[in-house]
Each structure stands twice: as C-alpha cells, then as structure tokens.
From Swiss-Prot:
Name by which UniProt lists this protein: UDP-3-O-acyl-N-acetylglucosamine deacetylase
InterPro entries per record: Ribosomal_Su5_D2-typ_SF, UDP-acyl_GlcNac_deAcase, UDP-acyl_GlcNac_deAcase_C, UDP-acyl_N-AcGlcN_deAcase_N
Active site: H266 (proton donor)
A single MF term (Gene Ontology): metal ion binding
Cross-referenced SUPFAM superfamilies: Ribosomal protein S5 domain 2-like (SSF54211)
Group of enzyme by EC: hydrolase
Gene name of this polypeptide: lpxC
Length: 307
C-alpha cells in the first residue's frame, strides 16, 4: 500500500519574508492522517488555521496566498508547497508567526533540507491521488495551462517566453516525467528571479522588501547580477515548474496526469486547478493498496519510518 506521509518529529527555522521583509519563525509539526497541509498563524490570538485549499487562494500577485473570510492570510507558500509535493508529504501543521512564509534562498531546497533532517514517517492510511480523466484548459490572452490524462505518473511540459538578452539562445522549455525524475534533484534548487527595473515599483507597493541577491536571481537589462551566476542552465524555466508544482498542490494531493503550460503563473495555475476540481467527471481519487504497490511518482524515501 502507498501510505500517507508526515514527519517523524517537529523542526523549526527562521528566515525573512520575501515581500514583507520581516523576520519569520516557521515550525513544521507532524499531523494525523487525513489532516492535509494546514498553515497556522501563531502570532494571532486565537491562533488562526488556514488549510491548503484551491478555493482559499485569494491573492496571486507575485506569490500564492491563502486568505480566509476574515482577511487573515499566509503568503508566499508556493516554494514550501512545492517541497511538500516533491517529498510526498500529505499531513503537516506549518506554524508561522507572520503573514508570510520565509523565502530562505528563493528555492525549495532549504525546505527539503528541513524535511530530510527530521525524516518522514509513513502513516497507516492509503495515500490519495487525483487522477486526470479528461483534458482541461484555461487561458489568459496568449498564456495557457492545461491538464491531460497520463496514467504513468505526473509529467510536466512548461515553456516561458522572456524577451531579454540573458534568455536569448537559452532553453525556455522543460519537459520532465516525475515517475522517474526526482523533484529534489531536478527542480528543488531553482531560485525565484526578478528584474532590477521592476524592484523600485514593487517596493513602492510594499512588495519585494526582503528580496536580495541572497534569495533571488536578479537581472539588470543585460545580465545576471548574482556573482555565482545560475545554478543550472535552465534555472528560470525550472523555477516556473517549481512554482506550478506548489500551486497545484493546493488540492492537498499529488496529481496523476500531464500538466502543459505556456507563460503560466500563480493566477493561471490556480485557475486551472479550480476548473479541474469543479468538473467532477474530469478527475477521480485513487489509491494504491495492493501488496507491493508502487508509487506512480518518484518520492524521496530515505529513512522512512512506518507509523
């Protein structure tokens, strides 16, 4: 049986919010079966819980944010969400003492490190997957995103299109099949990126206040400003993949199917996920409970403990 997963024990980290610039303390705590991913604002009295849910994503300006009916939010959850998806974590409490998840180094890798540090515990309940049965497509101008049936696991085909000297001659398309490819190896270290020409405006809107060369790839009109350059040749498109993985994990389940997109972003990713979930005949929940069942997606499995 492919089982649900949580952590063996709790772990804590401190960082800076990308947009708020505020110091944030974040704690991961194990959660019981069928809990899902739940964000907890511990700086509020009483503590406010915001479960990961596609319908609760109410702000997608430069990040993905969960916002409840009272306006309480947890922003910039996409990189952590991608790490949880990549590690196959089903149940977790994420405590934060601020309205934003810390940006760390701008990728999912520091979150992966924290999860690996304490280890994963398999739980005594079957892991549920969302399997795509019918194709779904959403558009916004020339941008589009779509799901297609793909029974062998989860496959991504994503293309970006930036008109900038750094992108010229660089591969802006990436195709990965996660039935064999590892999220940790292929995607997790790709950092968020931005342009110097946008920063002054963003900061005037109280955004990107915590952004720096330590947690983002920054480009001027001609080149990458980070002294160490890029972590891989296709870091830009792979970071967009990372964002999409995090955005699509707002359904709290891994997806069995193919995701294709052109110039997508947080808003379009969420729009696609909502369109899928609203069309009940387009998907089904499946489990793998037979003896010796194999997961259709390659998850990190070092140091697993069975609950």
């Amino acid at each position: 049986m492919i089982r649900q997963r949580t952590l063996k024990t709790s772990v804590q980290a401190t960082g800076v919010g990308l947009h708020s610039g505020r110091k944030v303390t974040m704690t991961f705590r194990p959660a019981p079966v069928n809990t899902g991913i739940v964000y907890l604002r511990t700086d509020l009295d009483p503590v406010v819980a915001l479960p990961a849910n596609a319908d609760q994503v109410r702000d997608t300006v430069l990040c993905t944010a969960l916002v409840n009916e009272a306006g309480v939010r947890v922003s910039t959850i996409e990189h952590l969400s991608a790490a949880l998806a990549g590690m196959g974590i089903d149940n977790l409490y994420v405590e934060v003492d601020a309205p934003e998840i810390p940006v760390m180094d701008g990728s999912a890798h520091p979150f992966i490190y924290l999860l690996q540090e304490v280890g994963i515990r398999e739980q005594n309940a079957a892991k549920q997957f969302v399997r795509i049965k019918q194709s779904i497509r959403v558009e916004d101008g020339d941008k589009w995103a779509e799901f297609h049936p793909y029974r062998n696991g989860f496959k991504m085909d994503l293309e970006i299109d930036f008109q900038h000297p750094v992108f010229e001659g660089r591969n802006q398309r990436c195709v990965l099949d996660f039935s064999g490819a590892s999220f940790v190896k292929e995607i997790s270290r790709a950092r968020t990126f931005g342009f110097m020409r946008d920063i002054e405006y963003l900061r005037s809107q109280n955004l990107a206040l915590g952004g720096s060369l330590e947690n983002a790839v920054v480009l001027d009109d001609y080149r990458v400003l980070n002294e160490d350059g890029l972590r891989c040749e296709d870091e830009f498109v792979k970071h967009k993949m990372l964002d999409a993985i995090g955005d699509l994990y707002m359904c709290n389940r891994s997806i069995i199917g193919e995701f294709r997109a052109y110039k997508t972003g947080h808003a379009l990713n969420n729009k696609l996920l909502r369109a899928l979930l609203a069309k009940q005949e387009a998907w089904e929940l499946v489990t793998f409970e037979g003896e010796g069942a194999k997961a259709p997606i390659a998850y990190y499995d070092n140091g697993l403990v069975l609950a």
